[in-house]
Amino acid sequence: MENVFDYEDIQLIPAKCIVNSRSECDTSVRLGGHTFKLPVVPANMQTIIDEKLAISLAENGYFYVMHRFEPETRIDFIKDMNARGLFSSISVGVKDEEYEFVRQLAEENLTPEYVTIDIAHGHSNAVIEMIQHLKKHLPDSFVIAGNVGTPEAVRELENAGADATKVGIGPGKVCITKIKTGFGTGGWQLAALRWCAKAASKPIIADGGIRTHGDIAKSIRFGATMVMIGSLFAGHEESPGQTIEKDGKLYKEYFGSASEFQKGEKKNVEGKKMHVAHKGSIKDTLIEMEQDLQSSISYAGGTKLNAIRNVDYVIVKNSIFNGDKY
């Protein structure tokens, strides 16, 4: 592996601008059978997404992935989304009951448009077998498989039938995999994304380590089609986490998917909990992300997201923040 770097080590280099206003730039992206307003998706975590927010995102032209931590609600969720004329996008694990769940969907003629196989270490036979099971019983579902961190994993999951792969092992803010296990892409997530994207023939979703809106543009530069984001989406009015008041300020809970708070027990814990300052409406954040990405496209010298993929970059090893807290 040559050139190991992360988001804060990279600056993209501007190309000649061809628009009069950034509002001329189009941030939309196609994934599966739909086109979405932004190449961004809130993480499929319990404190980030719930049914209500999923409906709102789908109605407004954004992608979402429902989490898998209330498995018994998934069938009703798919039916509800279908009744509303919206796309359904769910997560599954790889345990035996998930195989039964997929068979049940097929029997009831329920085909979610998107199914994400959501496992911490996605380069495994368990995931490959679940991809094959999904493709057999729900051939029309768009299958996203993850999470992975190597080109070999991307190739194997694609060959098994995955329609997209999700890249990122432990770079998230409430993920402590790197500390608990010594493994992962924390600290070099952007380089891992680049490495994986070179091997991919299907879309890649970058997952974890995004701390600023500029990191979305950097993810696209290095091969992501879609960018999954947790902490930047935590703490909004619409976020499912509990609201807490501390010293007159409002905060919301945000915890990792393998944390004891999510599991209800202290066993194989690879996530932690934090309190995030209350940020107002998620709609405002999505609009700001869109405007910032429009600016990124204008700096890239284009009118569409793809322009970002062609820009030059430099590696600034002392970090672009110069030690300042952003």
UniProtKB/Swiss-Prot annotation:
Which SMART domains is this protein grouped with? IMPDH
Picking any one GO molecular function of the record gives:
GMP reductase activity
Q: Does the keyword GTP-binding apply?
A: no
Which top EC class is given? Answer: oxidoreductase
Q: Which reaction does it catalyse?
A: IMP + NH4(+) + NADP(+) = GMP + NADPH + 2 H(+)
Q: Which GO biological process categories is it annotated with?
A: purine nucleotide metabolic process
Instruction: Tell what triggers its expression.
Output: Expression is regulated by PurR.
Q: Which InterPro entries match?
A: Aldolase_TIM, GMP_reductase, GuaC_type_2, IMP_DH/GMP_Rdtase_CS, IMP_DH_GMPRt
User: Which positions bind NADP(+)?
Assistant: 204-227
Specify whether Oxidoreductase is a keyword of the entry.
yes
Keywords on this record? NADP, Oxidoreductase
- Offer a single GO CC term for the protein: GMP reductase complex
Question: Active site at which residues?
Answer: C175 (thioimidate intermediate)
Q: What EC number(s) are associated with this protein in UniProt?
A: 1.7.1.7
Q: Which SUPFAM superfamilies match?
A: Inosine monophosphate dehydrogenase (IMPDH) (SSF51412)
Q: Which NCBIfam families does the entry link to? A: GMP_reduct_2, PRK05458.1
Which family is it part of? Belongs to the IMPDH/GMPR family. GuaC type 2 subfamily.
> What is its biological role?
Catalyzes the irreversible NADPH-dependent deamination of GMP to IMP. It functions in the conversion of nucleobase, nucleoside and nucleotide derivatives of G to A nucleotides, and in maintaining the intracellular balance of A and G nucleotides.
Q: In its UniProt entry, what is this protein called?
A: GMP reductase
